Amino acid sequence: MRACDLLKRIKQHYRRSRTNPDATMSLIDHLTELRTRLLISLAAIVVTTIFGFIWYSHSIFGLESLGEWLRRPYCSLPQSARADISPDGQCRLLATAPFDQFMLRIKVGMAAGIVLASPVWFYQLWAFITPGLYTKERRFTVAFVVPAAVLFAGGTVLAYLVLSKALGFLLIVGSGVQVTALSGDRYFGFLLNLLVVFGVSFEFPLLIVMLNIAGLLTYQRLKSWRRGLIFAMFVFAAVFTPGSDPFSMTALGAALTVLLELAIQLVRLHDKRRVKHEALIADDEASVIEPPSSIPERSYTATRSHDDVT
């Protein structure tokens, strides 16, 4: 029944959008719209979370199980850097409480669900904002959702590649004196934090481009802020990177600097196109019509000479 009610509300929303092209909405309509889009986002996250919960310990569509895939950076470390607590000599993480494994599986499944459902809830977020924009600005909906999902995925991939280097530095530094026995909760918590920080950070250049498209940020201003923004990227990486190891901090700062420069160049091209477009519009405008001038009075001398000839 709830699914049917949700589909009815969605149909009513799209019916209203066809009959109300100006998108004028009352406060109640705005709240209804927000509730509908939140329900759609939550439904997508629930479905993908269930998928992630199953994928955690099972191979799906020929893919390796999510748990093995996430554990690989830790297991790739030398055996001298991690505690050998498994009787069969296999790489295992430590569980210190009865419900650790179950709760960890839920956390990992939920994190995977949020990432897999990111195209859906990114679209719902932007679609809720677009009624306050002009019609031409709504065309950028798809252009916002697709790059946002790609950038988030790119950030998580970079974080995964950096993870083994970060763990190698953090765990091998004092391996001559002590050995690290990581619990599953601590390890996956560190991993998920790293993935989220990298994924969210990669959205910053997209935010710059969207502010420029909205007319709130220009290339000249970004050009004057370039050095300060690059410095801010590395400060952000140093403060928010989990573990504070030099590998992850440098990787995040360098990646954000490259993406920032790419965003600045896109803003420069967009501003050039905007100036050319405004110049064409100015040329197409009608010229100002001057008021008519008065006709000079007929000369009396010229009239008389004409009469003499006739």
Curated annotation (Swiss-Prot):
It holds the Pfam family TatC. Part of the twin-arginine translocation (Tat) system that transports large folded proteins containing a characteristic twin-arginine motif in their signal peptide across membranes. Together with TatB, TatC is part of a receptor directly interacting with Tat signal peptides. One of its GO terms (molecular function) is proton motive force dependent protein transmembrane transporter activity. InterPro entries: Sec-indep_translocase_CS, TatC. The keyword Nucleus does not apply. The chain crosses the membrane at residues 38-58, 109-129, 142-162, 190-210, 229-249, 250-270. It is a multi-pass membrane protein. GO terms for biological process: intracellular protein transmembrane transport; protein transport by the Tat complex. Residues 291-310 are annotated as: Disordered. GO terms for cellular component: TAT protein transport complex. Keywords: Cell membrane, Membrane, Protein transport, Translocation, Transmembrane, Transmembrane helix, Transport. Belongs to the TatC family. It comes from Mycobacterium leprae (strain TN). It comes from the Bacteria. PANTHER family: SEC-INDEPENDENT PROTEIN TRANSLOCASE PROTEIN TATC, SEC-INDEPENDENT PROTEIN TRANSLOCASE PROTEIN TATC, CHLOROPLASTIC-RELATED. This is Sec-independent protein translocase protein TatC. The Tat system comprises two distinct complexes: a TatABC complex, containing multiple copies of TatA, TatB and TatC subunits, and a separate TatA complex, containing only TatA subunits. Substrates initially bind to the TatABC complex, which probably triggers association of the separate TatA complex to form the active translocon.
